[in-house]
Amino acid sequence: MNKFVSQSTIDTFFDGKHADPFSVLGMHETSNGIEVRVLLPDAEKVFVLSKETKNVLCELSRVDERGFFAGVVPNTHSFFAYQLEVYWGNEAQVIEDPYAFHPMINELDNWLLAEGSHKRPYEILGAHFTECDNVAGVNFRLWAPNAKRVSVVGDFNYWDGRRHPMRFHQSSGIWELFLPKVSLGQLYKFELLDCHNQLRLKADPYAFSSQLRPDTASQIGALPEIVSMTEKRRKANQADQPISIYEVHLGSWRRNLENNFWLDYDQIAEELIPYVKDMGFTHIELLPLSEFPFDGSWGYQPIGLYSPTSRFGTAEGFKRLVNKAHKAGINVILDWVPGHFPSDTHGLVAFDGTALYEHADPKEGYHQDWNTLIYNYGRHEVKNYLASNALYWMERFGLDGIRVDAVASMIYRDYSREDGQWIPNQYGGRENLEAIEFLKQTNHLLGTEIPGVVSIAEESTSFAGVTHPPYEGGLGFHFKWNMGWMNDTLSYMKKDPIYRQHHHSQMTFGMVYQYSENFILPLSHDEVVHGKCSLLGKMPGDAWQKFANLRAYYGYMWGYPGKKLLFMGNEFAQGREWNYQESLDWYLLDEFHGGGWHKAVQDYVRDLNHIYQKNAPLFELDTDPQGFEWLVVDDYQNSVFVFERRSKKDERIIVISNFTPVLRQNYRFGVNIAGEYMEILNSDAQQYMGSNSTNTSKIVTEDIESHNKAQSISIDIPPLATVYLKLHKVKKVRKMRKTSKVEDTAVKTEKKIAKGKTTRTKKTVADTVSEATEVKPKKTVTKRAVVKKVKNAEVIAESTSVENNVS
């Protein structure tokens, strides 16, 4: 029995219940001199060595057969640097004593973490390579204020929670321990004795690397180096720049052909980046990459927020992918999920025996739609954990933005809940005031620490001010997904063209609220799963009409105000729904399998993107009403839409869409600027497998009034197609219109009548003008059937009777 340590105290160590190991273990002053005490289960002998001379100073006595050793070092009365020589059977090992090191967290960090205002808690908490007293090792820190004991366990200590209990900082609730000679890649977890005396084995919330499911341990990894934001990347995120986003799920974009297994980050980068560059996309948006246990969640139920998923390799590999994208001039956005987390036992749930990260009341803390838990945004440490995570991804991996998932579920307490299933806020309202404040805080943190980083909200309600600055009462996002536009327009496109005239407003209503927020038009992964069909599958008609409808829709979308987002596979009109367990159907791009149809859509999207990037009217004034004007908004009978886009320099592009399978010949509409227009895009062109009803010659305005405009043009609008006309040359407008000559003649006739030189007819001047300007209907034109031979199939577009437009 040791004179200075009771048996009951020793028992608490072996029972895993001692809360203050540094008060007992290590070096201590006693009346007999300096005593060294160590806990080394299974050790047979332990000697104390002088670190300076390497001489043996004393052998420690085995105070307890289970492995508690203690002994007074002769002739010493002050602390000194020492090592331990430990004999495990016949094998001797010289080690550092973890309990010989002083606390490493400084007072400022401890105070900021306690307050929940540390900008970068990931630099303090978690596992960090460092040196203490010139000894290299890893410093482990964990926030678990209600735990009775916390130990770090891993393959370096046989996962034995008795061996390395940690030091507790009462003021912040943080546990800390420095372990020498622990190396990169080693596995670890934290073993907690919770407030109910239950053992919990938890992954590190701040781990920089994690095991691949079904394993759940954290891995010791280095904190990635900072990647600075560049002016080029910053500019590419601005609202007056072209932003066309390619949304990607890395696990199913492409897979290994031999075993259907994932490609790693480097393999993906080798293929994905050149493809995106060639296709003309400006940004890549990656579905969530924080480590997650369930493949079927697609990453939207993460546990390791600071760990890039090991499915595709290491954090360094992911960083190389981002760097390769930047070298190609492509910005990278990451889907980020701060709204909820899964209830897997190794994660955040009941972390220290209490509802530490979540709400205790299920009415606030449980998400019934997804069977997940909701973060407690009212707790400063939780807000700090989440907000700094967004900064971590931007700063340490050089990402250019985040897209925040499911914002509506965060900001409304009654989201997807019936009456009685939710708790009002302090004012009796339904808004989650703490979540709203958290979002503002996160956007402010990103904006001040990395100016130029873009934040995007997936917000599906009409919550006001999502993209307005907080000082105006907004949330501070830069862009918001326009879910209303997406739902309305897809609903319209699903309908048979014969019924579209009754739903005309679905394509125009978006302009009512277009300038209330900064919008992105999203055709995301959510629209091609869970029985919703692929985008191609949503389109009505036979094969020819399906592809024509989709091309026309894309053209309308790329011409409409708002940045663009397209989920992978939609750029070549994949026919089946997205399956996260398989690669995209790239074989459809082969002539044999796809008959050229899918390749044509791919070519079309590529051309759309490049035209979009090169023409400022299509993007520069997306958030300014001066950049848009309807030219034909009410032609519901023909399902025709015409609008004009403008740039800051007053360049003009006119977008014309015809959503019926009827060729609109000599369709006349008014324009603002007289001059020559050139057709720069036609979704019905032959190279896109259309019927090739194009306007190849210059289109010159005429002095004919139409749609309340003095100048107008007349073109053929192809069936189920979108056409872009670009103002090529401005001309001076003649003072008199063609109808004015008729009016002139009629007036002269009236004067002759007055002088008796001719006889008045019953026709008035107005009658004369009306007759002269009347357009006689032409004969019905029949558009021949378009036939495209495909291997083993024949795709036929039905012959359609087309009436001439007389507007």
From Swiss-Prot:
SMART domains: Aamy (SM00642). Keywords: Carbohydrate metabolism, Glycogen biosynthesis, Glycogen metabolism, Glycosyltransferase, Transferase. Pathway: Glycan biosynthesis; glycogen biosynthesis. It comes from the Bacteria. One of its GO terms (molecular function) is 1,4-alpha-glucan branching enzyme activity. GO terms for cellular component: cytosol. HAMAP family: GlgB. This is 1,4-alpha-glucan branching enzyme GlgB. The gene is glgB.
